[in-house]
Amino acid sequence: MKPVRALTLSSVLAALSVLLLFLGSFFDVTDLAAVIVASFFVTLVMVECRGAWPWLLYISVSALSFLLLPGRFVSVEYALFGGIWPILKYWLEKLPRLPSFLLKLLVGNALAFFAAWLGLKFFGLEVPGALWLRIAAVVLWEAVLILYDFLITRLIVLWCVKYRARFRRLFR
């Protein structure tokens, strides 16, 4: 893709990402959903533009969300997980299947625990008191991480098979 078109696509998707994160910051339930949808935009730029464009999108949305959003935790979720995950996924999937899967779990858990630690220390999140709730949260996170990784893969396939030709015809 030509640099001007890549810049245009990245800019529009950055604006949409910040808008989604803004809307997601109003309710505690919608923040993770907004982060996931915004991360799909990074995936789209990863597929279409390659190079430094996904990094620029990730950095610009992270910076703008920290500057503009009223709730800071959604910015932390995006910066530490949602925005960086499609880029990390691309590089980790160049490895063989089993090491790739294990490294994705390790990196995903490290990012999640770091985000949770920041939430506990700086954003006033509360930890449930019962040990079984903590264990259930970790198990649920593992399931969400695997499902999220699978959905990104399916989204890439869907984009390449069904929508990419239409998109390219639109931006000739």
PLM region spans:
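Membrane-interface helix termini and inter-helical loops of multi-pass transporters
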Residues: 120-133
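Hydrophobic alpha-helical transmembrane segments
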Residues: 7-11, 33, 55-59, 75-76, ...
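Mid-bilayer segments of alpha-helical transmembrane spans in multi-pass integral membrane proteins
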Residues: 71, 106-122, 142-150
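Short helix-perturbing small/polar motifs within transmembrane alpha-helices
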Residues: 78-117
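Hydrophobic transmembrane alpha-helices
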Residues: 1-53
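Interfacial aromatic-anchored transmembrane helix boundaries in multi-pass membrane proteins
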Residues: 22-31, 62-91
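Alpha-helical transmembrane segments and their cytosolic interface
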Residues: 134-172
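Membrane-helix interface "capping/anchor" motifs
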Residues: 45-56, 93-99
